[in-house]
């Protein structure tokens, strides 16, 4: 008895071969965006360096927050040389790597730009504001790293997207898992980065780990 399934399959294959027909995979939204941007994928770039370079750098560079803040307040250049980084071009401020440990004294969790304020020196007053997302302001993690720089990117748009990708990565890896209730009075330990704040303003820490 003839095998009609095989015969039909061969006939279809023959038609496809003769007509030059081929099946093309539909790209995902991310793949389509990457193709449209010439292969630039900031989220993938951040993921590839996060464990191997970013975490080890922050762990090595970060000082105790109270020490970093005290030195930055009296001598920003000295604090920057020891704990910080800034782009050589332009007038970018220092961004410092710090290890913050303390007690949460205030929590704002209703906003998308949620944060907690932390007392790091046990005086009952807030010393730093820690962003807990999902919306994270600034690009402190990118700006604290001495192994990435603007000249490696095509333009300011790519550089900005790269900075935002760090925030997206941190949010998915760490911040989404944090509880949102009953935070006041809890202890917090975090390593991250923050730009030199304006006088009288709290340091705004972006968590790295």
For each of these PLM feature ranges, what is it?
Residues 1-21:
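Sec-dependent bacterial lipoprotein signal peptides
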Residues 5, 20-209:
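OB-fold and OB-like single-stranded nucleic-acid-recognition modules
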């Amino acid at each position: 008895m003839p095998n009609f399934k095989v015969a039909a399959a061969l006939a279809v294959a023959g038609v496809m071969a003769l007509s030059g027909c081929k099946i093309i995979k539909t790209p995902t939204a991310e793949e389509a965006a990457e193709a449209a941007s010439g292969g630039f994928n900031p989220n993938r770039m951040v993921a590839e360096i996060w464990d191997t370079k970013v975490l080890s750098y922050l762990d090595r560079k970060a000082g105790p927050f109270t020490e970093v803040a005290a030195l930055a307040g009296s001598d920003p250049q000295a604090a920057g040389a020891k704990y910080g980084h800034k782009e050589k071009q332009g007038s970018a401020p220092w961004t410092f790597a710090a290890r913050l440990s303390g007690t949460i004294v205030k929590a704002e969790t209703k906003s998308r730009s949620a944060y907690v304020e932390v007392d790091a020196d046990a005086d009952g007053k807030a010393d730093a504001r820690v962003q807990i997302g999902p919306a994270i302001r600034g690009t402190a993690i990118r700006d604290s790293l001495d192994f990435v720089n603007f000249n490696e990117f095509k333009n300011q748009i790519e550089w900005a997207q790269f900075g935002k990708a760090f925030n997206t990565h941190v949010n998915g890896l760490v911040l989404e898992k944090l509880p949102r209730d009953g935070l006041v009075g809890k202890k917090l330990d975090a390593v991250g980065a923050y730009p030199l704040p304006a006088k009288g303003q709290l340091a705004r820490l972006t968590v790295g780990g």
